[in-house]
Amino acid sequence: MMIRAEDAGHGEEQTLLEWLAAQPGDPSFYAFLALLIFFGLLLHMGVHRTIAKTLDDRAEGISNELDEAKRLREDAAEMLASYQRKQREAEAEAEAIIAQAKTEAKSLKAEARKEMTERLERRTAMAEQRIAQAEAQAAADVKAAAAELAAQAAEEILKTQLKKSDLNKLVDADIKTVGQRLN
């Protein structure tokens, strides 16, 4: 593209690029010019057709998605009705099961109460028997401890109050008594 120099103010002809290069220019002017060139290239390459086709394809896709959504909504409504019907049937069945379970629970409760009473009676009897055994054992232990304590006390008394000669006499007397008992 040629530009007359008179328009540019020089008096000779220049190309547009020469004229632009000679401009001491404003950067915003060059940015605007670059933008125009960029858009011109895009139009030349047919980008607008590609964009239009993409938008048309997108619109068709959205239309298809809306149709699919409508179909899915109808299917969902049918499924909801089916599930509500099944839920009502399940609730009726559950009520019947609950009634049967209550009846069985009552009989199991009575049986468990009877078993518990029997177990409690057996455990009470066993506990009473153990207590009686423990009492007998305790009485025997007390008697043994008392006898041992009495023997120790007697030994201490004898040691402190009797002389050695008296002790020998007692031992001799006990030996005679043991001898007589053995015969």
From Swiss-Prot:
Any Gene Ontology CC annotation: plasma membrane
Function: F(1)F(0) ATP synthase produces ATP from ADP in the presence of a proton or sodium gradient. F-type ATPases consist of two structural domains, F(1) containing the extramembraneous catalytic core and F(0) containing the membrane proton channel, linked together by a central stalk and a peripheral stalk. During catalysis, ATP synthesis in the catalytic domain of F(1) is coupled via a rotary mechanism of the central stalk subunits to proton translocation. Component of the F(0) channel, it forms part of the peripheral stalk, linking F(1) to F(0).
Membrane-spanning parts: 27-47
Pfam family, one: ATP-synt_B
UniProt similarity note: Belongs to the ATPase B chain family.
Entries under InterPro entries matching the protein: ATP_synth_b/b'su_bac/chlpt (IPR002146), ATP_synthase_B_chain (IPR050059)
Cell compartments where the protein resides: Cell inner membrane
Membrane topology: Single-pass membrane protein
Assembly description: F-type ATPases have 2 components, F(1) - the catalytic core - and F(0) - the membrane proton channel. F(1) has five subunits: alpha(3), beta(3), gamma(1), delta(1), epsilon(1). F(0) has three main subunits: a(1), b(2) and c(10-14). The alpha and beta chains form an alternating ring which encloses part of the gamma chain. F(1) is attached to F(0) by a central stalk formed by the gamma and epsilon chains, while a peripheral stalk is formed by the delta and b chains.
Gene symbol of the encoding locus: atpF2
Protein name: ATP synthase subunit b 2
A GO MF label: proton-transporting ATPase activity, rotational mechanism
Organism for this UniProt entry: Maricaulis maris (strain MCS10)
Key words, A-Z: ATP synthesis, Cell inner membrane, Cell membrane, CF(0), Hydrogen ion transport, Ion transport, Membrane, Transmembrane, Transmembrane helix, Transport
Taxonomy, superkingdom: Bacteria
